[in-house]
UniProtKB/Swiss-Prot annotation:
Signal peptide: none annotated. Its main location: cytoplasm. This is Glutathione S-transferase C-terminal domain-containing protein. It holds the Pfam family Methyltransf_32. Transmembrane segments: none annotated. Keywords: Cytoplasm, Phosphoprotein. The gene is GSTCD.
C-alpha cells in the first residue's frame, strides 16, 4: 500500500471467533473490528481468529475484510501469555509485553496505525472526532462508550439468538440509541452552526415558532414533504459531509444579518443528528453499523411492524450508506444493505424516557439533614467512629539515592517538591506490598498512570511479575520507555479498562485511583482473592454506577442513605492545604468514614482490612491507605 512506513512495528491482532451465520460473524466485536479494518484498508496487522477451546476444524471466514490482510486461526492455548490474561479483541506488540485490550481501545489503535501507515488518509483520523476523544473514556464514565462497546453489541447478539415464539420486545439498548438520536446535537461550534440554521430557516420562510415546533418531531428530517424541511436539514448534511471530503468550501467573509447576530441562544433552532454522535461520521458509527445492520435484517424479515418504534435509527442506517467507502467496506465484510420503508414520527411518538427514575428515598427523605456533622453524629450513635489503624513502619523508606534514575518519579517530568511527595507516597505503598509479596507473585498496578508504583515494584521485586494497567495510552508509553531504560524483564503493560484484565494475580495496588475506580480495584481483588493496597482519591466524584452502589457495607447501609453518604464524599474532598485547619480536619474525618465503609464491605467478603494514614501525612492531601488481606 502506498505510503506505508517500513519502520512500523509488527503487531498482532487477536479476535474471538465462535461461529459465522448468514454473513454475521460472532461475537459482534469481531464483526466490528473486521469492518473497521476494511474501511481503513488497513494491512499493518497480522490477524488471528481465536477459536473456542481447542477447536481447529472451524472453516475460515467467507468474507476476508481486505485483500492485504493476513488472517490465521489459533487456539486459546496458543495465545501469548499477556493476551491470555485479557478480554479480546487485543493487539500485541513484539516482544509480547505491551498489549491493548477491549473493543474501544483496539479500534482507536487501528485508526491511529492506519493513519501512521498512510498520513494522506486524514479522513481516517477524523473518525476519532473532535480533539480525538471518540470512545476514549471508559464505559463507566462515557454513555457512548458503554452503548457502543457493551450494551448494543450484547443486546443485538441476544436478540439474534431469540426463537421469536413469543412476540419479542425491542432491546432497551436500541431504544436508548433512538432516544440519543432524538436529542439536540452539541458540538464545539454549536452557536455558529445554529445561527446558520436560523438564517436558512428564515430564507425558506420558516419562522422561529414553526421551526421549534418542527424540532419536536425528529422524523421531519427524513425528507418529508412539509415546507422548509429539506432546507433546514441541508445545513446538518452539508456540514457533516464536508468533513468527509478533501476539498472544503471556504468560509463566507460576509457579515451575518443582524437578526442572526442578535438572536438569543435560547431562540436558536437545535441541530439534528446526521450521524450517531452528532454531525460528524465517527468511530461510534463504525461500531454501530454492523450491529444495527444484523438487527434490522431480522426485524425486516420477521417483525417489520416494529420498525416504527425506532425511526431515527432506521434513518441513520440509510444515511450512513452514503458515506464514502462504507459500501465497499460493507461488501468486503459480507454486509448487504437492505432497503427500509420511509418512516415518519409525530410529536406524540417520542422515544421512551429510559433515564433511571430516582428512587423513592432520593425523591423524599424527610430525615435527611445536609452537612457532614449530622451525618457523622448519626454514625457515632451506631458506634461507627473515625478510626485509623497504626502505621506498621512509619519511618521506612527506599534508599532513593542508590536507585537508578529511571526508577525515581523525578523522571516523570514533575517539580522537585512534587517528586519528593511522590517518593514519600511510594515509600508507603512499596512497604505494604513488599511486606506481603512472595517470589513468583503477580502484582497488578491498576490505574498505573506513568508507572511510578509499578516500575519501583518491578525493580525492587525482580522475582515477581508486575503488570501495569492503564487506559491512557501516552501515560503507558512513557512508563514503558522508563522500563526499557532499566532493562526490566518482569513487567507487562496493558492499555485497557481494568475489567478487561481477567488474569489471576496475588496483589493489587492503586495509587490515587479516581472516585469509583478505587472501588472497582477492590472489587477486582475480592473476586480474585488477592491482597490489595489502595490509596483513594477524588472522593467528590464517587456516585452510584451500573457496577458500584453506595453505601457499600451492610453496616453503613443500615445507617446512612445514599444522600448522606454523598455528603461524606463531598466533604472528604475538602483536604487541600490552603483550606482552614478545622475544615481540613473534617475532610480527613469524612475520608476515613468513606474508606471505613469500603473496608467493612471487604471484610464481609472474608478479608482483613485496615485504613491507615500515610507517613508523613503531608505527602498528599489524599493520604489514606486501604490495606486488605484475604483470611
Amino acid at each position: 500500500m502506498k505510503g506505508i512506513k517500513k519502520s512500523l512495528t509488527e503487531e498482532y491482532l487477536y479476535l474471538d471467533f465462535s461461529h459465522q451465520k448468514e454473513g454475521c460473524i460472532f461475537p459482534l466485536h469481531t464483526s466490528v473490528t473486521l469492518f473497521l479494518l476494511s474501511y481503513c484498508d488497513c494491512t499493518v496487522f497480522k490477524v488471528f481468529l481465536v477459536l473456542p477451546g481447542e477447536s481447529t476444524g472451524i472453516s475460515l471466514l467467507k468474507n476476508v475484510p481486505s485483500e492485504g490482510v493476513e488472517i490465521q486461526t489459533i487456539s486459546r492455548q496458543e495465545l501469548p501469555p499477556i493476551v491470555q490474561s485479557c478480554c479480546l479483541p487485543a493487539v500485541v506488540e513484539r516482544p509480547d509485553n505491551f498489549c491493548r485490550a477491549g473493543l474501544a481501545v483496539v479500534l482507536r489503535h487501528i485508526i491511529q496505525k492506519s493513519y501512521e501507515a498512510d498520513p494522506s488518509k486524514k479522513e481516517i483520523l477524523e473518525l476519532l472526532g473532535f480533539k480525538k476523544t471518540c470512545l476514549k473514556a471508559c464505559a463507566e464514565v462515557s454513555q457512548w462508550t458503554r452503548l457502543c462497546e457493551l450494551t448494543v453489541p450484547l443486546a443485538v447478539e441476544n436478540f439474534l439468538k431469540e426463537s421469536f415464539d413469543q412476540p419479542p420486545t425491542i432491546p432497551a439498548a436500541i431504544l436508548e440509541l433512538e432516544k440519543k438520536l432524538s436529542e439536540p446535537v452539541r458540538v464545539h461550534n454549536d452557536d455558529k452552526l445554529r445561527r446558520q440554521k436560523l438564517k436558512q430557516q428564515k430564507a425558506a420562510g420558516v419562522g422561529p415558532s414553526l421551526a421549534k415546533e418542527k424540532t419536536k418531531s425528529k422524523g421531519h428530517r427524513q425528507e418529508t414533504s412539509e415546507e422548509g424541511d429539506s432546507s433546514s436539514a441541508s445545513l446538518e448534511l452539508k456540514v457533516a459531509f464536508s468533513k468527509l471530503t478533501i476539498h472544503k468550501e471556504p468560509a463566507s467573509a460576509n457579515r451575518e444579518p443582524s437578526y442572526v447576530r442578535k438572536a438569543k441562544a435560547s431562540d436558536l433552532p437545535p441541530l439534528d443528528h446526521v450521524f450517531a454522535e452528532g454531525l460528524y461520521f465517527t468511530l461510534a458509527d463504525i461500531v454501530l453499523l454492523p450491529c444495527i445492520h444484523h438487527f434490522l435484517v431480522i426485524i425486516c424479515r420477521k417483525l417489520s411492524g416494529k420498525l416504527v418504534e425506532f425511526p431515527l435509527v432506521a434513518a441513520w442506517y440509510q444515511r450512513i450508506q452514503e458515506v464514502p467507502r462504507v459500501q465497499t467496506a460493507a461488501s468486503q465484510c459480507g454486509i448487504q444493505f437492505i432497503s427500509l420503508p420511509e418512516l415518519q414520527t409525530t410529536s406524540s411518538q417520542q422515544p421512551p424516557n429510559l433515564d433511571e427514575a430516582p428512587s423513592a428515598e432520593e425523591q423524599n427523605d424527610p430525615s435527611f439533614i445536609g452537612g457532614p456533622r449530622p451525618t457523622m453524629t448519626k454514625l457515632m450513635e451506631k458506634g461507627i467512629e473515625v478510626m485509623f489503624s497504626p502505621h506498621p513502619c512509619p519511618t521506612w523508606t527506599l534508599d532513593w539515592d542508590t536507585l537508578p534514575a529511571a526508577v525515581s518519579p523525578k523522571e516523570g517530568k514533575m517539580s522537585s517538591d512534587r517528586a519528593l511527595r511522590k517518593q514519600q507516597q511510594l515509600n508507603n505503598l512499596v512497604y505494604m506490598v513488599t511486606n506481603q509479596a512472595k517470589p513468583g507473585d503477580r502484582i497488578v498496578d491498576f490505574c498505573s498512570g506513568g508507572g511510578h508504583v509499578g516500575i519501583v515494584l518491578a525493580h525492587v521485586l525482580p522475582s515477581c511479575q508486575v503488570i501495569l494497567i492503564e487506559n491512557k495510552e501516552l501515560s503507558l508509553i512513557r512508563a514503558k520507555k522508563r522500563s526499557d531504560e532499566l532493562g526490566l524483564s518482569n513487567i507487562w503493560f496493558i492499555q485497557a479498562n481494568m475489567e478487561y484484565f481477567t488474569g489471576m494475580f496475588n496483589i493489587g495496588v492503586a495509587l490515587h485511583a479516581c472516585g469509583v475506580a478505587t472501588d472497582m480495584v477492590i472489587e477486582h481483588c475480592l473476586k480474585t482473592r488477592a491482597s490489595f493496597v489502595t490509596c483513594p482519591c477524588c472522593y467528590g466524584f464517587i456516585q452510584n454506577t451500573s457496577k458500584v452502589n453506595f453505601p457499600k457495607s451492610e453496616l453503613f447501609k443500615k445507617t446512612l442513605s445514599y444522600k448522606e453518604h454523598m455528603i461524606l464524599c463531598r466533604f472528604a474532598d475538602q483536604t487541600a492545604v490552603q483550606l482552614p485547619p478545622q475544615r481540613r480536619l473534617i475532610g480527613k474525618q469524612c475520608m476515613c468514614l468513606v474508606d471505613l465503609d469500603r473496608a467493612r464491605a471487604a471484610e464481609e467478603h472474608g478479608f482483613s482490612v485496615q485504613v491507615i494514614s500515610m507517613e508523613p501525612e503531608s505527602c498528599s492531601p489524599k493520604n489514606n491507605m486501604i490495606v486488605g488481606v484475604p483470611i
